[in-house]
Amino acid sequence: MSKTNNRRSSNWYGKMDKDGFIHRSWMKSQGLPDHVFDGRPIIGICNTWSELTPCNAGLRNLAEGVKRGVWEAGGVPLEFPVMSLGETQMKPTAMLFRNLLSMDVEESIRAYGIDGVVLLGG
């Protein structure tokens, strides 16, 4: 963590204060080793996968491939869910919730300490 950079994630994971310690500790509790917090970019993978949404069924496997690619490129992938809208399953229509989905995605990106994002949606 001796590297200094201007990445957004460094405000979460790169600081050597109490907040930085807490952020790193929570992520390490998920099995991430110490060395991933050395200034690498944190890449969010926003996924609308759901068993209720048939058109998004393939996104679960696709997200795993994206994670491998992010690791191979030197980043740290962190997947996060957002609401999934399935036109064939929602009544009266999924159209009523599209703005809410947009807000869900935008605010999740804004709220988390990520440097980039891959959006997966059907």
Predicted regions span which residues?
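Metallocofactor- and cofactor-centric catalytic cores in central/energy metabolism, strongly enriched
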Residues: 1-122
